[in-house]
Amino acid sequence: MLERNFKSKQKEDFEKMGWIFIQLVADSGVPMGFPDTLCLSPTGYACYVEWKKSKDAKKQPLQRYWNKKLNSMGHDAFFVYPENVEEWRRELISKPRTISH
């Protein structure tokens, strides 16, 4: 499966549950290697995703850097590919976050 088709399917499924997926583009002030997508849940949870076409797809050094940096700051950042997508989906759907005002 092509990465864009895989990513589109996840986006479509999550948007049906009220999520917002924002595509981050490196040439718009987003640093090189920063995750592809910001995922916002309807309950206030947010995470970053770097989509990969397979578990063996190369992760660039800056992608690894940003994934580690974001996680160390308390944000959730993931490398997601077809082989781990179900685990990722379960983790996101189970997040017990609620909206705070």
Question: In which residue ranges do the predicted regions lie?
Answer:
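Catalytic phosphate/metal-binding cores of nucleic-acid and nucleotide-processing enzymes, i.e., regions
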Residues: M1-H101
